[in-house]
Amino acid sequence: TFLFSNSLTHVTSQLKTAERHLPALHMYEDTWGSGTCIGDSLNEFVKQYSHAYLTRNTVVLIMSDGLDTSEAGQMKEALQEIKKKTSLLLWLNPLLGTPGYQPERTRIKEALPFIDIFAEAHRLDSYVQVSREINKQR
C-alpha cells in the first residue's frame, strides 16, 4: 500500500499493524492539501516497485481528485506502464460527484485511456457501485 501527495510513501507495514502504527501515518498529513505530484509519484512507483508488486493478477486502485501538479505527460507515462502489467486499473475520484466537474478539462484527461473503471468516491453508495463494476470486469 502506498500513499502519495508530493512524494510516494510505502505504508504497507504501518497498515498491517494498524493499532501500533496508524498514528504514524499522521506524520504525512502536512503534505496533504498542498498539491499532488501524481505523475512523479506514479513514475517513482513504476521504477522502484512495479517489478515486485505488479502482475497480470494485480488490481490497482488509485484514490485521488486527479489534480496533478507534475509536468504534463508524467501521469500518462506511468499509467501506461501500470496498465500494461496489471489486470484492472481503478480510479476513484471524489470530484466526479461534484456538479459541473469535467475531467476532460483537467490533467486527469491524459489518464482516462488507461483507466478501466473511473468512478466517483464522495458517498458510501459510490463504493458499492464500484464493487459491482469490479465484479463485472473480473
Give each language-model segment a name.
Residues 79-138:
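Von Willebrand factor type A / integrin I
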Residues 70-73, 129-130:
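Extracytoplasmic/secreted cell-surface and envelope-processing proteins
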